[in-house]
Amino acid sequence: GTNFAIWAAAATRVELCFFDDVNGKLVETKHELTHRNGPVFHGYFPGIKPGQRYGYRIDGEWNPARGWRFNPNKLLIDPNTHLLYGDLKYVPEIYSHQASDGVGTGNITIKDERDNAQYVPHSVVTANVKSDQVRLRTPWSKTIIYEAHVRGLTAFNLDIPEEERGTY
């Protein structure tokens, strides 16, 4: 089985959604995470194994002026996932607000009710493997820290449209 947990302090409801391909069709199964410890919603699912695709749908107040854009119609990836399945498709349905194109042009105060699951990557359950990475112990005397500024890096880059070069 697999434990799932997500921090969502201002959320009122969190659904964990599993995705499977059945006869060439994407099938979604939703499970409300009813266990909550403070800001963390969580649950254990005994039959879930590595390879299972999933995502979260999180509900709460829609108040763009406060930065709250909860929209249960939008599938979110797990911020702690180690693996993603699928590509992001730039279509209006991926935005939480009503967008008219793939770059999000539209009215950001109106919630979009369309589902986005077929257009966004899904998180994938991976095996619980201990990391064999070893922390580098480079002494400060041999450490180099590079500092870069967007303006300086882009001012003369010919791959960037001229009107955007050197801007933030």
State the predicted function of each range:
Residues 1-29, 33-34, 45, 144-146:
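Insoluble glucan recognition modules
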Residues 7, 55-57, 149:
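Residue-level recognition of well-ordered secondary-structure positions
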Residues 9-11, 61-63, 150-155:
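Short, solvent-exposed loop/turn segments at secondary-structure junctions
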Residues 28, 36-40, 47-145, 156-159, ...:
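The feature marks proteins involved in alpha-glucan
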Residues 165-168:
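Short, intrinsically disordered, charge-balanced linker/junction segments flanking boundaries
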